Amino acid sequence: VGLAKGLRKVGTIYPLVVAVLPDVPPEHRRILVEQGCVVREIEPVYPPENHTEFAMAYYVINYSKLRIWEFVEYSKMIYLDGDIQVFENIDHLFDLENGYFYAVMDCFCEKTWSHTPQYQIGYCQQSPKRVHWPKQLGPKPPLYFNAGMFVYEPSLPTYHDLLHTLKITPPTPFAEQDFLNMFLRDVYRPIPNVYNLVLAMLWRHPENVNLEAVKVVHYCAAGSKPWRYTGEEENMDRNDIKMLVNKWRDIYDDEMLDYNAVADPAADGLQLTAVLTEAAGVVRFIPAPSAA
């Protein structure tokens, strides 16, 4: 709901689609519909059974994100996690060159990355000159994106390849994010962090952040979710964090941004469709050209 209202505020000309898992209750679906969302149900996707310990227990359900490659009635989509807010219009991302996968590079500096050699030696792709990659560890790792926001093209062949590859790929701690990075490494193209500001960048790489230019904020840091923010967790008492949380809350609380408060949604290009998964994901789209 907060994201739908945020997209209304920035005046997107594109609809927003979304999918729910079967266990999303009717009451939650009704709320989405009342906010102008169209709910599309998807079936969950699970990784092969093994004893992998995910960085967060709920990551296991995030593999259901792979279903959105099946949405071939649309030629291009922007995926957004449910803990994201859009503060400036990003419609121009739909004009990016076809044939590639676009996303923002992740940061390896938080403790959730402690299982990786990057974290253990202090290396981060956000500041690669700060700590150089040691030769004894072999080739430098390929660029690695955060999968909370990305621009992609639905494709049934890609969808089937994703599911087939998943069946034979052992799960890793960052679940579908690790998997997508592996699968899409040859077509991945980085985009600036203004399109997906991971909050850890504020204290890990402040030199790389221009808050005034940020268009999309990802409230993924522990304690940063605006709907349950207390300011008690580590780094959450920062003024920039408080400001970003308040910006999210201002949008959510603004009744003028409710779907029913828009007199003529079609005239404003604000027909919103949304799908909330248990992974809390949403998707914006461009319709595919008609056969005619």
UniProtKB/Swiss-Prot annotation:
GO CC: one term? cytoplasm
Question: Which residues are annotated as active site?
Answer: K65
Induction conditions: By cold. Follows a circadian rhythm; accumulates mostly at the dark phase transition.
A biological process from GO: galactose metabolic process
Q: What is its EC number?
A: 2.4.1.123
The enzyme's main class, written as a single word, is transferase
Cofactor dependence: a divalent metal cation
* A GO MF term: inositol 3-alpha-galactosyltransferase activity
Q: Report residues binding Mn(2+).
A: D81, D83, H218
Q: What is its main location?
A: cytoplasm
Q: Which family does it belong to?
A: Belongs to the glycosyltransferase 8 family. Galactosyltransferase subfamily.
Instruction: List the protein's name.
Output: Galactinol synthase 2
Q: Which organism is it from?
A: Ajuga reptans
Query: Which lineage do the record's taxonomy fields give for this organism?
Result: Eukaryota, Viridiplantae, Streptophyta, Embryophyta, Tracheophyta
Q: Which gene is this protein's source?
A: GOLS2
